[in-house]
Amino acid sequence: MDEPLFSCVLPCAKGSEQVLQQEAEQLGVQTLSIAPAVVRGKASLLTFYRLCLWSRTASRVLLVLAHENVDSAEAIYEVARNIAWEDHIAPDDTFAVRFNGLGCGIRNTQFGALKIKDAVVDRLRDIVKRRPDVDAKTPDILLDAHLHKNELTLALDLSGGSLHERGYRQAHGAAPMKETLAATLLYRARWHEFCAQPATLIDPTCGAGTLVLEAAMMAADYAPNLQRQHWGFTRWQNHRPALWNKVIDEAQTRKNAGIAALSDYVFYGYDQNPVVIAAARANAKRLGLEDFVHFAPKRLEDLTADFGARGFVVANPPYGERLGEVQELIPTYAALGHWFKTLPADWEMAVIASNDALLKRMRLRAHKYYQAFNGTIAAQIVHYRRSEQPESQETAAQQKLAQASVGISEQAQMFANRLQKNIQKIRPSAERAQTDAYRIYDQDMPEYAVAIDCYGDAVVIQEYAPPKTIDPQKAQQRLFDVLQVVPEVLALDERSVFLKTRQRQTGKTQYNPAAEKRNEERIVYEGAARFLVNLSDYLDTGLFLDHRPMRRLLFEQAAGKRVLNLFCYTATASVQAALGGASYTTSVDLSPTYLDWAQRNFDLNALSDRHRLQRADVMAWLHSGKSQFDMIFCDPPTFSNTKKEQRVFDVQRDQIALIDGCMQRLAAGGILYFSNNYRGFRLEEALCARYCVQEISENTIDFDFKRRPKIHRVWKIMHRSDGEQSAEK
């Protein structure tokens, strides 16, 4: 006699519907329809068991008990009460209701679940004179209710919870990939067909190993849910243990045979984080696959092509949605594409990513694209074949941009041309200035609102935050144009390009380091000086390029003088004064981070101990002593917080107190160089009356800042008697 068929609903991730339909039909489901995130059909109890054990892509397996039109909360109650719950739930069982949807008087899902719970309890109390208890966390029976428009579907959740919880992954990384999505990726890329013959599989960004382990299970004919300990049918009144055990035994037999054949396969998972590698190894051990799957800490950039003639690459690299800024991931995607092109012709690759611009950075020709969702994140699964990659593409990508066929826009080509012209003009000036740290571009084209600074063999791109009126997608595309063009025009490795977003700073954020320090340090030169710069961890690099002329002026005038540097930052001005022969220098700043950096700059230039670093609030320090100086350089921030003194410094408001304090420390015949970069700054007339003041800003703008002459302003200030005597001479 034929087994009776029941209506089934198989929820899944959006984008997985067709894969799940094919899988369900192979397991015995008679498919009726597919819709976004769900497959519906008919199935026998045996097929339901097989779905629970063998479906790699379904989120849940639901057996429908009722599907009715409703128009009110009371109608929902009546539909639920008319179900013969006594045939499904024993009086001693616990149950819970999961409700999705709104409408028909249901304003929140808790109320919808309560109406169904009341109907179940009322029915059982009337029929069997007892009511079951509710257990929201680990119920024996889990009911699933879905309300869409006026249609209510009420079902038993035979899976007892999401089927991505296979039971083997108890440790994972920061952004784990669901096992069901991993299986979808593998099906989309036809891994289940590829692995019909022995092969090698590699995940170069494996995290806790989900993709590798799902691929190994697929190759071994290993039922994905064989490790699960909890099901939603074990206490169900219609459960048939003998039939279920038969399904389990069959799966165990297939698994044993499949694992025996795995010795002809090789599975590798790599990640630069040793913590997640340890988690991946533990997950493999729970599956009994530790002898066949090899996890090791390794950077993507360090991978070789020595993995055999035939194989498959799978990757779920960071998307840039939550794990980091998109621009920081460009080297990762570029390295992935470059490495894949070093593999033999019979290799294939499947990548899931959410950002099309990042995928383009791999410079690969896609075989097929598939839409997918990783949780709420819209993504793409892209299938590549090594044999379909033009052999000439890599060479073209490395040629000059003007000859390269890299698919950039006409506007991006104009930006590249401008950059080329700037470099040809600026580099000779930099050589004459004896420096390898200089600016080559600063918003020359309004569409590309960035500044580009060279630091030896590296580049820092500073993106000016676009106004809210600019379409964010257009702004991002222009940024990608910049990030694509710069390394090619300058012939740099993309890992030597650093991006920072410059926006209006607040007192609390202007000096904040990056969330995760990378410590990308370089040594640059400026005349006789050597400076340490950090290109990755702070908004500024430790060297203000626009003040190069001021540092040169201090070097030229410092011989035999006592020099004071206020708000000294990393004390690069003090270093130049010391190299220029200053009798001694004193550098004052409140930041221990920058004073440590300053000490490293002094050490780098082999300067003696007579050059003093002082941690102090500048305003308080000026009024706490009487020592005199022949030359003072004061370059305050526009504003800053001073926790210890419980005040906020504002350069416009506090300029008189600051300059008066400096002049009290300035010896007769001395010079104060006062500078700031606040564009709205106005020097108080009282200061001009009190001292001899001369603005010298025009003389402090060097070759690489001629396009932006208002980047800072500088005044030469002397005691009036000294200034008048100087003028007479």
UniProtKB/Swiss-Prot annotation:
Assigned GO CC terms: cytoplasm
Alphabetical UniProt keywords: Cytoplasm, Methyltransferase, RNA-binding, rRNA processing, S-adenosyl-L-methionine, Transferase
Pfam families: Methyltrans_SAM, RlmL_1st, THUMP, UPF0020
EC numbers, comma separated: 2.1.1.173, 2.1.1.264
SUPFAM superfamilies, A to Z: S-adenosyl-L-methionine-dependent methyltransferases
Domain THUMP: 47-158
Catalytic activity, as annotated: guanosine(2445) in 23S rRNA + S-adenosyl-L-methionine = N(2)-methylguanosine(2445) in 23S rRNA + S-adenosyl-L-homocysteine + H(+); guanosine(2069) in 23S rRNA + S-adenosyl-L-methionine = N(2)-methylguanosine(2069) in 23S rRNA + S-adenosyl-L-homocysteine + H(+)
Molecular-function GO terms, alphabetical: 23S rRNA (guanine(2445)-N(2))-methyltransferase activity; RNA binding; rRNA (guanine-N7-)-methyltransferase activity
Subcellular localization: Cytoplasm
Family: Belongs to the methyltransferase superfamily. RlmKL family.
Function: Specifically methylates the guanine in position 2445 (m2G2445) and the guanine in position 2069 (m7G2069) of 23S rRNA.
Protein name in the entry: Ribosomal RNA large subunit methyltransferase K/L
Source species taxonomy: Bacteria, Pseudomonadati, Pseudomonadota, Gammaproteobacteria, Cardiobacteriales
